[in-house]
């Protein structure tokens, strides 16, 4: 839910001749960012949010990403900075969205064997991020849950005509 190293990363990548991609793993409240419920209905241990990846496509996207992260801290903070679908509908221009890791709403539905819910959620995000800006994300981290999820994610992407992207659950130390 933060972009603390974004400017330094951008500068160093440019200096090295690498095209940087600025993004953030955001936390999405299951309902409104103003709802301070302590847990998701589907997983009381999850801390009240789902993960989602947002990547800036251009300067407008970077500015919207900054606005989303700021709103997460100022308006949606409940243990972590959280945003919601209303903010995503308002501030999605210039952003790509990836469906997220195992803690995403799509993957959590798959883990509960609720494929209809996974399809519904993916469809909602595909509408918000129209024009092929929503990607189904698969990862190869050798976890059994991920292997199961990947199988369903590939099928889901094909069924809904959504593009896919292979990633890894990366985080930084410094």
Task: Locate predicted features.
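Phosphodiester-processing cores and adjacent nucleic acid-binding clamps
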Residues: 1-174
């Amino acid at each position: 839910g933060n972009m603390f190293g974004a400017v330094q990363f951008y500068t160093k990548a440019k200096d090295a001749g690498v095209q940087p991609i600025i993004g953030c793993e955001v936390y999405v409240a299951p309902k409104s960012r103003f709802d301070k419920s302590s847990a998701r209905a589907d997983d009381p241990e999850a801390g009240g949010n789902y993960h989602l990846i947002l990547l800036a496509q251009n300067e407008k996207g970077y500015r919207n990403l900054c606005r989303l992260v700021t709103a997460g801290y100022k308006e949606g903070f409940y243990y972590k900075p959280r945003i919601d679908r209303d903010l995503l509908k308002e501030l999605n221009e210039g952003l790509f969205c990836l469906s997220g890791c195992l803690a995403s709403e799509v993957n959590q539905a798959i883990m509960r064997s609720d494929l209809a819910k996974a399809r519904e959620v993916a469809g909602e995000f595909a509408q918000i991020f129209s024009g092929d800006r929503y990607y189904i994300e698969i990862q190869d981290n050798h976890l059994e849950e991920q292997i199961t999820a990947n199988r369903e994610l590939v099928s889901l992407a094909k069924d809904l005509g959504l593009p896919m992207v292979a990633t890894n659950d990366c985080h930084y130390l410094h």
